[in-house]
Amino acid sequence: MATLLGAMLALAFGTGAVAAPVPDALAVPRLAFVPPAPGSYRLERIMKAPDGIVLESDGSLRRLSEFTTGKVTLFSFIYTYCTDPKGCPLAYATLHSLKGTIERTPSLRGKVRFVSMSFDPEYDTPVAMRSYGGAEARAGNGLVWHFLTTRNSRELAPMLEGFGQDVSVAAGKPPGQRAPVLSHLLKVYLLDGGGEVREIYSTSWLHPAVLLNDIKTLLQEPAPRGRKTILTSKLTSH
């Protein structure tokens, strides 16, 4: 019934809902090096994450800053119909693997979130993003993973620019496909609780062990002096 309802809603919104790749079918590449121990290095501040209006997978309007502050965040841009094995499916499989590790680590519970945001608001409606996220998009007792989109490309553009994420239409609409192929360089951003980007991962560095040690490194940093972190009920829900 839920699947049928999702399909009906997707048609009503003018887009077909796409399921996320099956993580077990996507092998995360072996790491060719041993990452340094958490806290043995420093991650410099690269830039402040941009802000803007986004749509949650339930259709509610929010500000992006609600999902990039208050916790250590792994943020990435995706599109639901991406089939490049070194693109969005790899990011999904890597984060899925890391999510399980974080949920089994008591010291990390409640301190980390994941955010995946669509490149393509025309096709990736809230319904499509909710379908893509599947069980990962449903908040439970574990790490919360948000699947966001925007109302249109005009509102998305400043956020893409702010993150330095390029995307282009690589080809016209292929036969049998609803949308053009989007060409982009895979990037996953690590943000601290203040919304500062502290690391940017490409395919070569995107591995659960690397991400985990970087998250632990950020969480070991002392809180800024004279600054109190006040989390509202809205922020603590993310």
Question: What are the roles of these predicted feature ranges?
Answer:
Residues 47-49, 67-74, 109-114, 124, ...:
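Extracytoplasmic
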Residues 161-238:
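Thiol-/selenol-based redox modules, centered on thioredoxin-like
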Residues 47, 71, 78-81, 86, ...:
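Sec/Tat-exported extracytoplasmic proteins
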Residues 46, 140-145, 170-176:
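A local structural motif
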Residues 90-159:
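Structural microenvironment flanking redox-active thiols in thiol-disulfide oxidoreductases
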Residues 64-94, 114:
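Short active-site neighborhood of thiol/selenol oxidoreductases, capturing the structured segment around
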